[in-house]
Structure formats: structure tokens, C-alpha cells
Amino acid sequence: MAPSGGQEAQICDSETFGDSDFVVVANRLPVDLERLPDGSTTWKRSPGGLVTALEPVLRRRRGAWVGWPGVNDDGAEPDLHVLDGPIIQDELELHPVRLSTTDIAQYYEGFSNATLWPLYHDVIVKPLYHREWWDRYVDVNQRFAEAASRAAAHGATVWVQDYQLQLVPKMLRMLRPDLTIGFFLHIPFPPVELFMQMPWRTEIIQGLLGADLVGFHLPGGAQNFLILSRRLVGTDTSRGTVGVRSRFGAAVLGSRTIRVGAFPISVDSGALDHAARDRNIRRRAREIRTELGNPRKILLGVDRLDYTKGIDVRLKAFSELLAEGRVKRDDTVLVQLATPSRERVESYQTLRNDIERQVGHINGEYGEVGHPVVHYLHRPAPRDELIAFFVASDVMLVTPLRDGMNLVAKEYVACRSDLGGALVLSEFTGAAAELRHAYLVNPHDLEGVKDGIEEALNQTEEAGRRRMRSLRRQVLAHDVDRWAQSFLDALAGAHPRGQG
């Protein structure tokens, strides 16, 4: 596969090398360029778990970050000249990749989120395949690869992130064979039979094989990738079982050996634990309970508004528990914080309408004037407010139909130094493999979800403390630093540069 529109990439001259020994390449920068009412611009922290996970790693290594600055650039706004070169923002070196409205529509909203996202999440929604989307995906990936090439010093380590940039490793290797390249996928990698639906399946696998190390959350994803690389590209692959942070698989392609491994991502659990102990956070948590009418129990959901997250499942389960009298309407409330997401994609617009209809129905059926049983907020919550909600709630509901990891579950656990609360967790999250002392449920089994919620609501204090203590032991020991270090250690031990 040619890296972009059939054109061969050119290896950069040494004069074009950057000065960063460590480069993160992701769809978004850790900050967005935002236009103010007076027409001026400012930088604002980007939403999303990827930024939360990677920013501390980048700061410690004094590296550079390549990504989209969050503003569409159609060439008509002269004041966007700030994006012309590297930027130092909050002590981070940023290399913006400028994307037009058409780029966003076809590369991001189209191929990334209407093709890859549903395919990789077990086809909960039917993937759409359009050649013009694919062509734009190739073109934008080439631009990211070129930006990374310009940012990286000779012999640097480049860490490419997630499904939007799966072609970048091969493209970057063609540009800069001196680099050590890692790739990590933050969403599930699908079973072989689903991935084979993809018209451009071989090109995707070839793109990933440009890396020295390809990482997934779980061993199953790594095994799927090895099978596909053998079947589609003809690599000689290892046949043993891939372990967690150990027992790496291998795919041999020509003179190169690509490591394949499982590295479950986590959160900055120490920082969350510290923040949740803060006096102001504790006071805000008490205020939240008061504002909700001092219910006996608070159920909490925190999600992007996405069809994979199972928000409708927990609402349906809560509604039926109320109808059956297993949950009392006068002493239990459900708070759902739903962060807006991909609002221009039709399936997401439909989902929002459906969720808001469900909320209205439940409140109409079981709420009272001034006392709804479901409190629904369709907006992002500031970090401290979110932590206060974690501390205030009695049961955390994490019920995705499919999720690569789900960091919200780990964030909740990290915030419960009081050993209070309970976690109801979908079996179809990556987190379920580690958080075995949660109340694990199958989101496709509504009765099972209802039973899990009821059990969590009615657990004894002793049983709850025992479960939370075990969950916290796991989350505090395996934080985001350990995730990053385990990946980067494995990358450093992968076959070295120059295998291009």
C-alpha cells in the first residue's frame, strides 16, 4: 500500500529532523484552540481519557505531542497562523495537524467513527463503508506521519495512539526508518470474522505492522491481530498465548520482528486518591447529596453519550426495579452524567433522543414534582465536580455493551478511600478482567443487570468494604505510570531501529 494516494513517501533529510526524543501522536492535542466571542483565540484543555492518560507521561519525558488542535481550518481564517509551527503551551511542545471541515467529516466522523468504531465494537451499529472516507483517512494519516517525522529527533521513540491513526506506523517507518515506533489501540480489537468484513482490512494490518510494538488492552485483541497478520499479510507469527504485560507475541515481516502485547491502561490513581480526600471535595460531595434531596442511595452513571456505553440498559433496569418495588422511588435516585459526543453523526443524534425520551418516561412514571428519580445532565463535568460525584454516590453503574477498558470504573475506585460505594461493571469491558471484585453483569441480560444493581444497593457495610479494598489494591498498584512504563519498556526491548 502506498502511504498516501498512491504517492511514495520520501525519507527525510537529516536537516528536517526535529529535536524531540519522545513524540506522542494522537488524533487530538491535549489542548484545543477555542475562539472567544471577541474573535480572539485561546487554548482550552481537550476532553477525553486519552489526554488524561498520556499528558503526565509526556510531561515527565519532556516530549512533543502531534495532533489536531480541535478547530476546523478551511484556509479562510488568517488568525489561525498560530497553527503554522510548533507551539509551547503550558510547558508542552505541540505540533498541530491542520484539518479542514471535509477532513473532519470524512476522516473523523466518517471512516473513524462510522466505519472503524462500530466494527471494532462488535457491530452494535452497522459499519458504513465509503471509498471517499477511506481515501481521506489515508490522506490524513499521511499528514500525521509527516508531522511526527518533522517533530522527532534522530533515533527518537514515537508512540502512535488509537484507531484513527492505524496507517501512521507504516507511513512513518517509510519516512524515518531510524525511529522506534510503538502503537497502542485504546478500543477493542475485533474478532477475526468481524474484522474480515473491512474492505481495506489488509491495508490496516500492514499499517500497524509498521510499528516495532503493537499494544492492546487485552490478550484477546493481541491474539486476533496475530491471526489476521498471518492470514492477510503472510507474517510468520508466534503461536503461544500472549500474557498481560508479559509473554509477547511476535510477527516476522521480512527482516523485521514486530512485538505484540497486552497492556491494560489505567488512571493516575494516586492523584485521584489524593484529590478525593480534599476537604473541599468532601464538602461538595455532601452538598450534592443535599441537592438531590438526601436520598438513602445514589446510583451514578458517567459516560460519553455513545451507543456502546449501555446507558439505555441501566435506565431500563432502573425503571423495572422501580416498577417491581425492588427499589424505592422515595429514597433512591439515579444520576446520569452524559458528555456530548460526535453530535453530527446521525446514530449519536438518535441515541440522544432515545435516552432523553427514556429519562422523561421514567420521571413521568415514578417521579414527583420537584423530585425526579433520574437526574440527567447532558454536559461535561469539571474534574473536581466529577470526583465529588464519585465520593457522593453509593453505586457506580458501568454497563457498556463493549468497551476497550473503561477508565471511569477505575477512577471511581481510586476516589473511594473511605472504602464506601459499590461498582456494578459490565463483563464486556477491559476493566472487568482486573476488577474481579466488582458486581459483574452481562449488559445483554437485563434480569442479571437488575440483580447486580439490587445486590450492590443492599450489600452489607462489611462486604462492601472488603470488595472496595480489593478493587483499590488493584487500581492503586496498576496506575497509568505503570501502564506507560510497561509499554515503553517493551518497546525499548523490541527489535531496534533500522529494520525498515
Swiss-Prot record:
Keywords: Glycosyltransferase, Transferase. The record marks W117, I187 as: Involved in alpha anomer selectivity. One of its GO terms (biological process) is trehalose biosynthetic process. It is an enzyme of class 2 (transferase). Gene3D superfamilies: Glycogen Phosphorylase B. SUPFAM superfamilies: UDP-Glycosyltransferase/glycogen phosphorylase (SSF53756). D-glucose 6-phosphate binds at R28, Y108, D162, R342. GO terms for molecular function: alpha,alpha-trehalose-phosphate synthase (GDP-forming) activity; alpha,alpha-trehalose-phosphate synthase (UDP-forming) activity; trehalose-phosphatase activity. Pfam families: Glyco_transf_20. Its EC number is 2.4.1.15, 2.4.1.347. Pathway: Glycan biosynthesis; trehalose biosynthesis. UDP-alpha-D-glucose binds at G48, G49, R304, K309, L407, V408, A409, K410, E411. One of its GO terms (cellular component) is cytosol. It catalyses: ADP-alpha-D-glucose + D-glucose 6-phosphate = alpha,alpha-trehalose 6-phosphate + ADP + H(+); CDP-alpha-D-glucose + D-glucose 6-phosphate = alpha,alpha-trehalose 6-phosphate + CDP + H(+); GDP-alpha-D-glucose + D-glucose 6-phosphate = alpha,alpha-trehalose 6-phosphate + GDP + H(+); TDP-alpha-D-glucose + D-glucose 6-phosphate = 5-methyl-UDP + alpha,alpha-trehalose 6-phosphate + H(+). Homotetramer. Belongs to the glycosyltransferase 20 family. Probably involved in the osmoprotection via the biosynthesis of trehalose and in the production of glycogen and alpha-glucan via the TreS-Pep2 branch involved in the biosynthesis of maltose-1-phosphate (M1P). Catalyzes the transfer of glucose from UDP-glucose (UDP-Glc) to D-glucose 6-phosphate (Glc-6-P) to form trehalose-6-phosphate. Probably also able to use ADP-Glc, CDP-Glc, GDP-Glc and TDP-Glc as glucosyl donors. This is Trehalose-6-phosphate synthase. It comes from Mycobacterium bovis (strain BCG / Pasteur 1173P2).
